[in-house]
């Protein structure tokens, strides 16, 4: 079985646990995704599965090249807007998946499972150092210049080094970065609507594309009852 799905961000809300705690969650429309291609180590050099999400209308299919359309025709699937390849180290994780199989949210994920969500952050345009790099800024009464207290300040010496070092935090474009939020928890699943409820926030705006995958850093351990060991009785 595949370890992840492509999803669309719907928005945020909150739910209440049986204990009465309020938990902020993000609603994701995860899948259904169709297997477009299955790759094997014998033929392709590694094990992977290619999934598609979001069917493309026929009037927009002409935007694809002939080789791209040929991939979908060979698999016998509709043309998808988004395609993602998921590599695995062990072919057993993919089971007997083949082209044309449909993956739903309840087949891939389960409640209380830890996941990683990857997406593109919101674009905020050209911003200053206080918003982009969380700089403190100058004192409000240290200068009479307009908005000088929001400036970057000193960025180097005159003669030594005589330049601005690469990587110096300066104003510039902020956002539109590929990031991954790790170890989020699946709070709930609604298979009828392909909805996945995830604790916390995920990157991107509403209707943004996301890739939801099994957490790379392990799953929560199930607490088991410790065995009570009897001490050996001393010999008399």
From Swiss-Prot:
Known Gene3D superfamilies for this protein? 3.30.160.810, Translation factors (2.40.30.10)
List the keywords (alphabetical). Answer: Ribonucleoprotein, Ribosomal protein, RNA-binding, rRNA-binding
A single Gene Ontology CC annotation of this entry is: cytosolic large ribosomal subunit
The organism's place on the tree of life at top rank: Bacteria
Q: Name one GO molecular function term.
A: structural constituent of ribosome
Cited PROSITE patterns: RIBOSOMAL_L3 (PS00474)
Signal sequence segment? none
- Which GO BP terms, alphabetically? translation
TM spans (from-to): none
What family does the database annotate? Belongs to the universal ribosomal protein uL3 family.
UniProt cross-references to HAMAP family, sorted A to Z: Ribosomal_uL3_B
Q: How does it assemble?
A: Part of the 50S ribosomal subunit. Forms a cluster with proteins L14 and L19.
Q: Which PANTHER family match?
A: 50S RIBOSOMAL PROTEIN L3, LARGE RIBOSOMAL SUBUNIT PROTEIN UL3C
Q: What does this protein do?
A: One of the primary rRNA binding proteins, it binds directly near the 3'-end of the 23S rRNA, where it nucleates assembly of the 50S subunit.
Q: What is this protein called in UniProt? A: Large ribosomal subunit protein uL3
Per the record, the gene is: rplC
